[in-house]
Amino acid sequence: MADQQKAGGCPVMHGAMTQVGESNLDMWPNALNLDILHQHDRKPDPMGEGFNYREEVKKLDLDAVKQDLHQLMTDSQAWWPADWGHYGGLMIRMAWHAAGTYRVADGRGGGGTGNQRFAPINSWPDNVNLDKARRLLWPIKKKYGNRLSWADLIILAGNVAYESMGLKTFGFSLGREDIWHPEKDIYWGSEKEWLAPSDSEDSRYGEDRASLENPLAAVMMGLIYVNPEGVDGNPDPLRTAEDVRITFERMAMNDEETVALTAGGHTVGKCHGNGDVENLGPDPESADVEEQGLGWNNKVTRGVGRDTVSSGIEGAWTTYPTRWDNGYFHLLLNYEWELTKSPAGAWQWEPVDIKEEDKPVDVEDPSIRLNPIMTDADMAMKMDPAYRKISERFYNDPAYFDEVFARAWFKLTHRDLGPRTRYIGPEAPQEDLIWQDPVPAGRTDYDVEALKAKIADSGLSIGEMVSTAWDSARTFRGSDNRGGANGARIRLAPQKDWEGNEPERLSKVLGVLEGIAADAGASLADTIVLAGNVGIEQAARAAGHDITVPFAPGRGDASQEMTDVDSFQYLEPLADGYRNWVKKEYAVQPEEMMLDRTQLMGLTAPEMTVLVGGMRVLGTNHGGTKHGVLTDREGQLTNDFFVNLTDMAYTWKPVGSNRYEIRQRSSDAVKWTATRVDLVFGSNSILRSYAEVYAQDDNREKFVHDFVAAWTKVMNADRFDLVA
């Protein structure tokens, strides 16, 4: 039959969807996207179950890798020649644009996963020709194989590039594990086109620049930071300064770090715009198969060397673009600059009456000197009063600039790696930095059973103990490895005053647990978690299950001085579906906020399901509300939530915003009340399938064991000392 196929017909009998077409979310756009909870599992991972990158990378000869990288920097390839014979600027841009996607609001983005290899980031307009940088690195990745991830190599290449040009870097840590497909959880914006202006449909802006939609940091879809030509492509350094400040604040950088990173990033390398942008081919994801994953290929003109087109802006920022020095500030502050356009038609600034010796040479012919350039963002470093003051200090104190930049670069490239306990390798700095959320080591030599007995006799209720432990641990974000129960920061500002933590109830519970912890010689962090375990064990016994909740001592107690209050504000929960609470009404539904929190905590959909069902019957609702407490046996760890939610003896009636009554069909009498977060486990077809499992008569014990396993996972999420 094969030879009878019609020309153009599909030989596959459509047994599986192998191309992207209409998905369930296309057909039902308001459905919960549970896929974000099940990304990056082992199925697409070619390394297999037994592979542990964080153990494998410890075998890496870092010195040998760095030696190879140093050699690569000046080994210009004919297929993509190095500017001035040095790839440093290209490698720094690659590393910068990997790390620079990080945003502090949700901890997502950053260089910790090697996601620059995949769409959409590999094809962003701001990343034109970074595919060439990664291909230049391929021989090194191939050589060191499983001991060196792409994520580590990309950042390391940027670090070595700076070192090769004369900067003393602050340090470097290995340990970034690659993903194998694009993330599904990161919201990059709602725009339907690249570089859509701020007045477009689905804009990320409201009335002013400060209204940039959370959690976004970049000003446009497809940019890493700000538009280098100006706001919406209109040059105005003071307006651009506002964008720069907002964007870098959302990357957890202050003004001094912002100036240092801008200047340090533009001390080396150049922009590329000596040609017609229209001559560039499709981006990597859109390119034909014979392009082998390379994009933006110019098949009309030469398209490499001095004729390369990337951003469209053309020129170097400094006189010596392959040397770390203070030349950026020398040119920026000592010359007047005028607005011009590049050969590609992009807005840029060029100096007026510049001395010939201050001009950089051509990338291919050192006998030719050309004007340096500044972007609108660079001019903001001169025109904005606060940025200008910092720029002048850096100009007058080069050693101070070197130190601030080295530290800011380290922060940029390591922010999403988490605390120092996760650092690997001989170049990992030993200094504790406040943005790492340091936690001192805790004790493990106390009597855990004696401590449990004292907690059990404390008079605290099951709900009080479980809620406090949960609130302490739920701040964990797997996106940037921040938050969690370790450190007991729930007793410190700002967490002790968060509405979601019920400050009055929290103060009472902590007052009891602090004394017990001190008497036992245990940390408060351990005691809070252990109290939650005690509450669960009591509730399980009351339901007829004798179970011990696993516990690993060793958490420490952080001090207020170790806690960056401003940075921790971003970890404040605005809703917690597990405790059936929403701070106020938002544009997104409560169940969507629960899904986002679940993904950040690293939980699966079944784990989310069993935890919600268990928390409801333990009396942990915020403020003691009874919404979703679908049981007559509160305080016992039963599967009643699922049994009653799936029971067709009841109907569900809306009675207000996010409020429902569960009524008996036979009498229409109100039996319970609930919220959307409760009812979604019966209405969403996937979540209902999990709810039915836990409602089954033969799964009462499975429910308890699964709840305890998921609970323990949350309590230990930030225990990096327990894993490789």
Swiss-Prot record:
It catalyses: H2O2 + AH2 = A + 2 H2O; 2 H2O2 = O2 + 2 H2O. Formation of the three residue Trp-Tyr-Met cross-link is important for the catalase, but not the peroxidase activity of the enzyme. Its EC number is 1.11.1.21. One of its GO terms (biological process) is hydrogen peroxide catabolic process. Signal peptide: none annotated. There is a cross-link at Y225-M251 (Tryptophyl-tyrosyl-methioninium (Tyr-Met) (with W-96)). One of its GO terms (cellular component) is cytosol. GO terms for molecular function: catalase activity; heme binding; metal ion binding. Keywords: Heme, Hydrogen peroxide, Iron, Metal-binding, Oxidoreductase, Peroxidase. Binds 1 heme b (iron(II)-protoporphyrin IX) group per dimer. Heme b binds at H266. The record marks R93 as: Transition state stabilizer. The keyword DNA-binding does not apply. Transmembrane segments: none annotated. InterPro entries: Catalase_peroxidase, Haem_peroxidase, Haem_peroxidase_sf, Peroxidases_AS. CDD domains: catalase_peroxidase_1, catalase_peroxidase_2. Its cofactor is heme b. It holds the Pfam family peroxidase. The active site is at H97. Belongs to the peroxidase family. Peroxidase/catalase subfamily. Homodimer or homotetramer. PANTHER family: CATALASE-PEROXIDASE, HYDROPEROXIDASE I, BIFUNCTIONAL CATALASE-PEROXIDASE. This is Catalase-peroxidase. It comes from Halorhodospira halophila (strain DSM 244 / SL1) (Ectothiorhodospira halophila (strain DSM 244 / SL1)). The gene is katG.
